[in-house]
Amino acid sequence: MSMTPEIKNILAEIGVIQSIYQNLFQFLPSFKVTDDSILPYGLKPHTRSVSWLVEQVITQQTKFRKKALGLDDVAFDMPDTCLHDCEITKNGKTYFVNVKIHNMGGRENKNDISAVEKLYMQYSANPDYNLIYACFGIHFKGIEIHFETDYMQLFSPQFLPIYVNPRNDKIQAFYHHDPVLRSRKEFMELLRTNSKSIVLKK
């Protein structure tokens, strides 16, 4: 597909967020989830065991370091129903970001990205809403977390290869994938066509 202004804008937004997070790496600490005496045998190395906590470290450090990162503001107090985890404002423009975590010790599998209905409704209600996913890699051993500075995947759901898991009606994709550049209209139609949700049917 040709590079329309819409597609160029989304790619530019992804580039801005990538630059911000690349700069954030210098501030992201390695840390222990808790004290050794509390969990003397550590945690099982499942991403779900620590993903929310690691996401909080990333979003809170982004806000705490906003001046050094050249940001106007960072908001992360979002309701649980919200598609994005944080709103990053730079030069007066707000970016909507959902932070994901990948365990570098595990395999690259397809992941549930988002419920189709939530994504469809948000993109329908707000034509200016562009969600950006930012996936950070971590090394997780015992109770210690280390960030992998050479791993970062940023993508727009609009450019995902569309596969909807029929069991839960969620888009599934690899964090690392080749983007499929498409218009918002095409994206919405693909969501509608592939969804099993009655709400989305014409």
Segments (PLM) and residue ranges:
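Nucleic-acid endonuclease domains
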Residues: 1-82, 95, 101-202
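Active-site beta-strand-loop-beta-strand hairpin of nuclease catalytic cores
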Residues: 87-98
